[in-house]
Amino acid sequence: MSHHLCIWLFRNPFLRACPQRHVFLSCQQFRQISLDTRPWNFRQKKTHVLYQLLNKSWSRGCCHQGTRKLWKHKALQKYMEDLNKEYQTLDQCLQGISENEGDRRALHRRHAQLAPLAAVYQEIQEAEQAIEELESLCKSLNKQDEKQLQELVSEERQIIDQKIHRLYSELLERLVPKEKYDWSDVILEVTSGRTTGGDICQQFTREIFDMYQNYSYYKHWKFELLNYTPADYGGLHHAAARISGDSVYKHLKYEGGIHRVQRIPEVGLSSRMQRIHTGTMSVIVLPQPDEVDVKVDPKDLRVDTFRARGAGGQHVNTTDSAVRLVHIPTGLVVECQQERSQLKNKEIALRVLRARLYQQIIEKDRCQQQNARKLQVGTRAQSERIRTYNFTQDRVTDHRIAYEVRDIKEFLRGEKCLDQLIERLLQSADEEAISEFLDESLQSVK
């Protein structure tokens, strides 16, 4: 065992990154450390040569199946090999001085573009080679006194799985082109659905709106209320808010669609029946355009004013402060009665109208490019049911990626649980985009 292990250590490319004091452990010292019956104490010291090397390796067995399957795709392998060769060629060209200044600038630009991809690809290649050598070593460990070492290797593979998953995910994230709207602010609208009694939908709408408000605070975004129409028993008919910050649309673009709830109502008329009710509410996520992106001609607008509706307030039902905008060319209608000032309500309504017009432009672009994804129900198919909140079973299910979360109350807090689901949706969307790219590549080759 010592002979094989020493050969593997000195051949391993990751050895250069390890401190020399680990390399020159004697065989007897190595055997005493590796066969310690208290591996947790040994791992805490982190002085074991195998542990140090495993920390720089990646397993191929238990990583995320979708990501791993994509990485093993022949078309993706060929694509990455070509990119890596191009990067190596550019690297050699830039070492010469024969190119003129214009060509050199173009080469530098392309070289910088490929550098992150090439770095991740080369790291994966080295890691897989190290794993193959490690697996070969493990096959030779068949003696009884080496059983504990095999168990130790098995434990450390769990850490390795996380690393290879992270590396594959990083590669896919760099390969997928970023949407130009991802960094936009958004206008988020929620609207209660209809069911027997109606109370369950309105209560659920308020909970979902509060969830996204809390999520905005969790992500350190700015949450600006634009419209809020309350219902009886603390429910909510409709609400809209502007959310601004870092990559807001990127994180919220897959939240648009129909959210379904299944629960026994606690308040309202429906609570008298004491049985499970099913209701829905809709979420619309609109990227907020700049002034230059969407221009609205005042001649295309019809402005109606009316008295605000709602509970309480001296301005309610006393002045025509509420505003309704009708965009004549498209037929879009926007109302706002949030502010006491008619002028402010008109500004808010115009902002929402521009966002909806901008959304139509985005949908048109995606249809023309034929790259709309199934996950993008927030922009392509608002009528699709994307998620179910089953209170009786304490479970949240996202139907697009078959993802389940327990503890609904924790999920509705709009913090870590929601953020984890959103990250999974983003990753699945990237994987789907890569799959479409690979399918197109194979068809073009045929």
Swiss-Prot record:
PTM notes: Methylation of glutamine in the GGQ triplet by HEMK1 is conserved from bacteria to mammals.
Residues annotated with N5-methylglutamine modification: Q314
Single Gene Ontology BP annotation: mitochondrial translational termination
UniProt-annotated stretches for the region GGQ domain: 298-362
InterPro entries in alphabetical order: PCRF (IPR005139), Pep_chain_release_fac_I (IPR000352), Pep_chain_release_fac_I_sf (IPR045853), Prokaryotic/Mito_RF (IPR050057)
Pfam families: PCRF, RF-1
An example Gene Ontology molecular-function term: translation release factor activity, codon specific
Gene3D superfamilies: 3.30.160.20, 3.30.70.1660, 6.10.140.1950
GO cellular component, one term: mitochondrion
Span(s) of short sequence motif GGQ: 312-314
Compartment(s): Mitochondrion
Domain writeup: The GGQ domain interacts with the peptidyltransferase center (PTC) of the large ribosomal subunit to trigger nascent chain hydrolysis.
Protein name per its UniProtKB record: Peptide chain release factor 1, mitochondrial
Organism this protein belongs to: Mus musculus
This protein's encoding gene: Mtrf1
